From Swiss-Prot:
The chain crosses the membrane at residues 97-117, 144-164, 172-192, 201-221, 230-250, 259-279, 323-343, 357-377, 387-407, 410-430, 448-468, 478-498. It is linked to Monocarboxylate transporter 8 deficiency: Consists of a severe form of X-linked psychomotor retardation combined with abnormal thyroid hormone (TH) levels. Thyroid hormone deficiency can be caused by defects of hormone synthesis and action, but it has also been linked to a defect in cellular hormone transport. Changing A150V: In MCT8 deficiency; does not affect homodimerization activity. It comes from Homo sapiens (Human). Changing R371C: In MCT8 deficiency; impaired homodimerization. Changing G484D: In MCT8 deficiency; does not affect homodimerization activity; impaired thyroid hormone transporter activity; impaired localization to the cell membrane. Monomer. Homodimer. Homooligomer. Its main location: membrane. Changing P463L: In MCT8 deficiency; impaired thyroid hormone transporter activity; does not affect localization to the cell membrane. Residues 1-92, 508-539 are annotated as: Disordered. This is Monocarboxylate transporter 8.
Amino acid sequence: MALQSQASEEAKGPWQEADQEQQEPVGSPEPESEPEPEPEPEPVPVPPPEPQPEPQPLPDPAPLPELEFESERVHEPEPTPTVETRGTARGFQPPEGGFGWVVVFAATWCNGSIFGIHNSVGILYSMLLEEEKEKNRQVEFQAAWVGALAMGMIFFCSPIVSIFTDRLGCRITATAGAAVAFIGLHTSSFTSSLSLRYFTYGILFGCGCSFAFQPSLVILGHYFQRRLGLANGVVSAGSSIFSMSFPFLIRMLGDKIKLAQTFQVLSTFMFVLMLLSLTYRPLLPSSQDTPSKRGVRTLHQRFLAQLRKYFNMRVFRQRTYRIWAFGIAAAALGYFVPYVHLMKYVEEEFSEIKETWVLLVCIGATSGLGRLVSGHISDSIPGLKKIYLQVLSFLLLGLMSMMIPLCRDFGGLIVVCLFLGLCDGFFITIMAPIAFELVGPMQASQAIGYLLGMMALPMIAGPPIAGLLRNCFGDYHVAFYFAGVPPIIGAVILFFVPLMHQRMFKKEQRDSSKDKMLAPDPDPNGELLPGSPNPEEPI
């Protein structure tokens, strides 16, 4: 029996401890000396009688090592949890319709009403000049800040809006933004002071529009994935219809009522938007709902973690992204000038034309067409060659701005405005796909937010500079020539981005090939692995 137990000990390994305990008490004098080994006090609390082998499995110490192995197996899968989260695209399937179409209508109202008012700022600017001309004859520079501030704040607040959207959700952020925009427009009707309208219309209305606009784009991803392109197309087409109708509406209101009552009528669109924003029922959880896996103990560490998360500057390590963002920011200096000063220029140069709002309708119509067409065209262009569409858009935008003073009839201005709207649609639509190509999908949101923030300051400064040139030279000719220069400079800068990206990609390929050549054999035994290069033939 002792020989068999030794042989089985070599064969069975750790389970032989149980066999030894079963064989020791049978016919051997060792039970008296059994309490001497200290590591195993559990199996012999009371010495059992020799002729009874049945109760021996009860004090069997074999389950102890089995429990230890099981505990290790339980802790092994913990670092990779399999709990499915709704915040990821893999664990969530959007409904692809249903209540989502109500959300699409709300997003269409949001985009159309916000940009319909902002794109018609030229009419509001001319109405504002009529009120301020009695106080100051050279008011073009001061009055241009009102519309420029409102448009610039939409872009300037974009990085901050992304933080609020992530923490509070789309519904709360959009509703609060629409409420602020309503307050800004409504309070603008109770004051005639230009400095107060800087705050009420320029800052309050502009910031409110930014907080209401960005969640309308994010919420579509909660309800659509496979049909997201269709949903975005419906929103773009609907907002274009708004952009075409708002110039006619504002001009009609300006002819019948004063500017103050016009602000009150426009504020009703923001009130309706505030109600429609309540339909932004989120289907994906915000980051506040997802528990953090890493415990942040102190308040200081938690604050630093949030700063690293939301103000991640890693996108600026990409040289191509820095050049691309700088080129677009440079082009934005003259981008918004025609929207603000075109109506006043037509009133001065073509005083016999009464339907000046037709020019803004043309810009809105071709802008919507450009957004629809550019999406399909950009899908067929691989990689960063999409930037060449932006290069072409900025070149045409700059040339068309310079051609505005050269037009001697109203029909020529209509043709110029058609091209201006088309360039606007191409430029805006392909911005997100280019950001995905430059920094990847994980950092694309931050890249777009930083880009919009960089565009804010040039867009705010452009119209007042053009108004200052109008005051200095007495007409808008030099102002529109100035507006055409920055887009052309931006186009030249953007032209080199794909070339530099291709050069950097080839350099990385050469470096990686050198690393592979200098890398040691991955097989420690020196055997030839499948797919490895053929070794040299033996001599």
